[in-house]
Amino acid sequence: MDGVSQRVDQRPNRIAVLSVHTSPLAQPGTGDAGGMNVYVLRTAVELAQRGIEVEIFTRATASHIPPVQEAAPGVLVRNVVAGPFEGLDKQDLPTQLCPFTAEVLRQEARQLPGYYDLVHSHYWLSGQVGWLTRDRWRVPLVHTAHTLAAVKNAALAEGDAPEPVSREIGEKQIIAEADRMVANTAEEARQLVELYGADRDRIDVVPPGADLTRYRPGDRAAARAELGLAPGEPIVAFVGRIQPLKAPDVLVRAAAELLRRDPGRALRVLIVGGPSGSGLQRPDALIELAAELGISERVTFLPPQPPERLVQVYRAADLVAVPSYSESFGLVAIEAQASGTPVLAADVGGLSTAVRDGATGLLVRGHETADWADALGALLGDRDRLRRMGLRAVAHAAGFSWAHTAEGLLESYSAALWEFHGARAGVGAGRMTPNQARSRALWRRRMGVRR
């Protein structure tokens, strides 16, 4: 069998997925739950449907949560007790990586040898755990960063706290150690290479997706009626965690500027999400900002919505705004477009991939209030243009499905398995990090394998 055939045939039977700081079962849009939660759960479900057992390890955050939950057929969530259930900020979680890792290793030790074929870690905290489990279990590590400290710190919102140096150091360690890196976009792959010295040959670009069976166009009037919104009022919606990084204040300020220019204009700003992060993190702060700007009666706040209600938010809106200072991709943009709603987004990170500028929405450079007000007014003032954009948005979003993401992950897993075990067996050159070299040397000694 040649090398290509061997690589194609390499496929995991069971994988360990690490999501230390947030559970895939948590409600997106509040706390530390967001797009990554959706990503972890949806890809796990798709992989399970392809015959791969998925076990997700996450930190337990409440005493009533059972140790193991079945998220879907073939998908288990293992809730690991590491530190107090409540009151532990994400910035404090590095102190709990040791007990978390210990419990993950203990759970694997109760199984037969070779229980997991591969580890996939999400976010840098999980990567630190993944690096150790990879060496202990002698299986490849695939890592997805989701966000990068160096990128976030280069585009901080006013008043936002920078990511600590310790995180950037941790990210560099993981990137050096991972067998494969999964980047959401080509832009993220470039950032990994240029900012972190990643090996481009070990990066796989696999775009996230959306649940296209759920997020699809529907009756706007019915959606507005369900949400208690006026039938004829232009609506621009923001969906996400209320934190400086996501910049909901940029939308509120732009709306206020638009109304200052034209006080008689009809406009509704719909904010859907809950508190997170630091600085501008409470809905109350955004409510106070709207009051200061004199547009309180034009802004409606809703808590985070489950998927069956969230699709109605997208359908109800004429436009969805994603004004983030940094985004590795932007799932909200794809979900909105799949629902037939154009997107007004910041021209940052993966949003230039998620949104086709001028076709399915508009990208705004920078976060100046006047620029956002101009773009907002231009789109809301041209109903025909919005309608055409909405049609193109659906077609564009059709290229982003979780099924497609899962297939991309399987290709990355296949490459990781082939390189990892091929290096052991002498098939191909393989690519080994220092820790891999040490662990594989130990494996050779134990198994009596000679070079």
Curated annotation (Swiss-Prot):
What are the disulphide bonds in this sequence? none
Instruction: List, in alphabetical order, the Gene Ontology terms for molecular function in this entry.
Output: acetylglucosaminyltransferase activity; D-inositol-3-phosphate glycosyltransferase activity; magnesium ion binding
Q: Does the keyword Oxidoreductase apply?
A: no
Which top class of enzyme applies to this chain?
A: transferase
Q: Which residues bind UDP-N-acetyl-alpha-D-glucosamine?
A: 27-28, 35, 241, 246, 305, 327, 335
Provide a GO biological process annotation: mycothiol biosynthetic process
Q: Provide the residue positions that the database annotates as binding 1D-myo-inositol 3-phosphate.
A: 21, 32-37, 90, 123, 147, 167
Q: How does it assemble?
A: Homodimer.
PANTHER family reported for this sequence: D-INOSITOL 3-PHOSPHATE GLYCOSYLTRANSFERASE, GLYCOSYLTRANSFERASE
Recorded protein name is D-inositol 3-phosphate glycosyltransferase
Q: Which organism is it from?
A: Nocardia farcinica (strain IFM 10152)
Which gene carries the instructions for this protein? mshA
